[in-house]
């Protein structure tokens, strides 16, 4: 229950795709353990990315009401920080949150931006030549984290 505070002003936001599944799991665990419900939303950051100019940007602008809410932003893997930067831009265009906390399943290091997770499932140092894949049963038919070259 660390930092839950006023649950009516809390919101969990998962970054599409695997972050959404992890966010829903987090929501269910908070409800099971604390007996409280916190809304959970899905966020597509494609239109806010700065590192994919070669491809057309797909998706809709963020419409999540973030005003005066404490947002728990959830993603599967934290790497360069660019996806999180895009998510922060999206959330800020939709309102002015009271605060934003970041929860990730895996932090693999190699930041290009000054971004740090508040909640980390596992730190897994990797090389730039490796990639980390998070598998979730809802999308992949299995659960697990693998490192690939």
Q: Which functions belong to the PLM regions below?
A:
Residues 12, 44, 100:
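Residue-level signature of catalytic and energy-coupling elements of molecular machines
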Residues 9-16:
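Short glycine-rich phosphate-binding loop at a beta-alpha junction
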């Amino acid at each position: 229950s660390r930092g839950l505070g006023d649950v009516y002003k809390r919101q969990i936001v998962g970054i599409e795709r695997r972050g959404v599944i992890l966010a829903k799991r987090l929501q269910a665990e908070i409800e099971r353990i604390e007996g409280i419900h916190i809304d959970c939303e899905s966020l597509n950051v494609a239109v806010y990315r700065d590192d994919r100019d070669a491809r057309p940007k797909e998706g809709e602008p963020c419409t999540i009401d973030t005003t005066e809410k404490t947002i728990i932003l959830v993603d599967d893997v934290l790497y360069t920080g660019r996806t999180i930067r895009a998510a922060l831009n999206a959330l800020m265009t939709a309102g002015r949150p009271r605060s934003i906390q970041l929860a990730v399943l895996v932090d693999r290091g190699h930041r290009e931006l000054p971004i740090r997770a508040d909640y980390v499932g596992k730190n897994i140092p990797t090389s730039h030549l490796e990639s980390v894949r998070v598998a979730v049963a809802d999308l992949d038919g299995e659960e697990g984290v693998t490192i690939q070259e």
